[in-house]
Amino acid sequence: MVHAETFSRPLSRNEVVGLIFRLTIFGAVTYFTIKWMVDAIDPTRKQKVEAQKQAEKLMKQIGVKNVKLSEYEMSIAAHLVDPLNMHVTWSDIAGLDDVITDLKDTVILPIKKKHLFENSRLLQPPKGVLLYGPPGCGKTLIAKATAKEAGCRFINLQPSTLTDKWYGESQKLAAAVFSLAIKLQPSIIFIDEIDSFLRNRSSSDHEATAMMKAQFMSLWDGLDTDHSCQVIVMGATNRPQDLDSAIMRRMPTRFHINQPALKQREAILKLILKNENVDRHVDLLEVAQETDGFSGSDLKEMCRDAALLCVREYVNSTSEESHDEDEIRPVQQQDLHRAIEKMKKSKDAAFQNVLTHVCLD
């Protein structure tokens, strides 16, 4: 018969240590098992790990040291662009001299000469800048050139970065955008096609999307309370009318990037063809007169088509053995005329397609 005293006796020191050891092993195995299961069912785990590695690499490239980042800030940091790796300068942008001058005065100067304006609230850089106008007119180029000239860290924010399947994660990512930008200031948060992200709110918006937008705007407002903060949200859009009125209020500095006029088109053509093999008799003013309604990207594509005509003629007129001996002839006026006609037909066809869809709707 077992006496009751046997069950009530105190554990020995070795038994206590053994029990603690077994509980520790059990807890560790349970933790890592659950963690492995969560990682296994998360389809974005691999992308998150790769994003973290990319973020750490970028942070080293831009010379950021002794700055601790959270998991969410690391996800945003993967979209950092090193200003030294941005090969866009003002000299790469033609026909927008007035816009460039205004940007230098209102955005770049207050950042580069901060000590001159620290006692004035009126002369601080704006917290929001909107670039709007037709597609292909250089809005993204201007944003990159602004960041490079001002020496700002450039966060190329994609709206998809802020969406997460877990409830509440999108708000944390939105908060990480601003906390990271503040840690890395001076910095520019650039949102291309901002109308797709911060468009007019309506009752049909998903709850998570509405909460994320509200969080984003609330944090954006926080930049205004700290006048020494050098964080700028810069957006580009083709449809400013679709932007929420609250967003427009937060972007008081706006620049209309319109389609280039005659002199602007001539300047753009000179820039595009500056280092190309072009016949000296080509009249770029005449080409500019024939390209009314062309955007900057249209002009570049037109020049590319003209150069390809020379390449195609060279390939068709020579044998494989003589390719190394001959040279491709320079681009001539007639090549540019043919490329213009091709581009006009393409634009007309696209316009007719749009009209057809409108009529069907």
Swiss-Prot record:
Indicate where the modification Phosphoserine is found in the sequence: S322
The EC number(s) attached to this protein equal 7.4.2.-
Task: Write out the function statement from the record.
Answer: Outer mitochondrial translocase required to remove mislocalized tail-anchored transmembrane proteins on mitochondria. Specifically recognizes and binds tail-anchored transmembrane proteins: acts as a dislocase that mediates the ATP-dependent extraction of mistargeted tail-anchored transmembrane proteins from the mitochondrion outer membrane. Also plays a critical role in regulating the surface expression of AMPA receptors (AMPAR), thereby regulating synaptic plasticity and learning and memory.
Q: Which residues lie on this side of the membrane: Cytoplasmic?
A: 33-361
Task: Give GO terms: molecular function aspect only.
Answer: ATP binding; ATP hydrolysis activity; membrane protein dislocase activity
Name the major location.
Answer: mitochondrion
Task: Show the InterPro entries listed in the entry.
Answer: AAA+_ATPase, AAA_lid_3, ATPase_AAA_core, ATPase_AAA_CS, Mito_OM_Translocase_MSP1, P-loop_NTPase
Q: How does it sit in the membrane?
A: Single-pass membrane protein
Q: What is this protein called?
A: Outer mitochondrial transmembrane helix translocase
- Record-linked SUPFAM superfamilies: P-loop containing nucleoside triphosphate hydrolases
Gene behind this protein = ATAD1
Its GO biological process terms?
A: extraction of mislocalized protein from mitochondrial outer membrane; learning; memory; negative regulation of synaptic transmission, glutamatergic; positive regulation of receptor internalization
Localization of this protein: Mitochondrion outer membrane; Peroxisome membrane; Postsynaptic cell membrane
> Which residues are on the Mitochondrial intermembrane side of the membrane?
1-15
